[in-house]
Amino acid sequence: MNGERHVAGRGRRRRPDGVRDVVEPRIAVAVVTMGNRPAEVDALLESVAKQDLAPARIVIVGNGCRLPEFAQRLSLPGEVTTVDVEENLGCPGGRNVALARLREYGDIDVVVELDDDGLLVDADVLRRVRDLYAADPRLGIVAFRIADEKGETQQRHVPRVGNSDPMRGGYVTGFLGGAHALNMEMLAGTGGWPAEFFFAHEETDLAWRAADADWKILYAPELLLRHPRTSPARHAIYYRVTARNRVWLVRRRLPLVLIPVHLGVWSLLTLLRTRSADGLRAWLGGFVEGLREPAGERRPMRWRTVWRLTRLGRPPVI
């Protein structure tokens, strides 16, 4: 590397094969935080500042908190925007705030969303993201690989069924909420995050909408976010909200005939895997809540999307 640093601006460059010019997408980075991880947020933003392709914009959302000054203190590149939200809107709601601000600016093509306690280890992540989107105009979502401090990737962080190799990239049916890139043109058609979910399964809702609109979802393990090893059950609301949102998800997105199949398979797996009696009680309460409460707009996927997801290795009943 020659030490040069570029800003992610929309321009044209010649492809290596010399066939045609490629439009370079403008990249933004969005981070949502509740203000309880100041050191981790600083470290994450410093890792963004070290990228060899600087983002055109950085948006930081304080989800129910007031944010400190970041831009000058951390020498952040690009245009830096902070947004304080009075109440905690949950992760999807907070990310919608960032997306709304980026839409107002109207000059961003791809947004990279990162968990506030993650860290970009490599300096070429944003450049690689830019190149992936420049090469494929129908690329909707890029899923990063998430690994802990030891470099290990938990199986739940691999967007495939079964014990899949975390280093095997390719097209998939879902993505990880902790680190990913989203095509702004795609979001204009599919809509943003399901804010009412607050936490859990919001990625699947967005992924299914993207797939149904014929956008591609790519798992790119070379794009690494280091993240502390955690369990989703660490959240007090985990069992209830996971169950409620799963029911909402299938009510919103699946053809009617597949809804009982999906819920039956998922319920059986939950009963086999869950060892906590309190957790099962909370899960059952969430399941009932998901059936009783409005699930939001019903927009079931087409049967050809069901087949496409099945061919990619994850039929939407698992």
Language model features with spans:
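Glycine-rich, basic loop-to-helix element that forms the pyrophosphate-binding segment
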Residues: V85-Y105
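Short beta-strand-to-loop acidic/aromatic patch adjacent to the donor-nucleotide binding site
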Residues: D107-L119
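Conserved donor NDP-sugar-binding/catalytic core segment of glycosyltransferases
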Residues: A123-Q154
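A recurrent flexible, glycine/aromatic-enriched loop bordering the glycosyltransferase active site
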Residues: D148, S164-L182, T204, R234
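Non-catalytic, C-terminal membrane-associated alpha-helical segments of glycosyltransferases
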Residues: V241, L256-I318
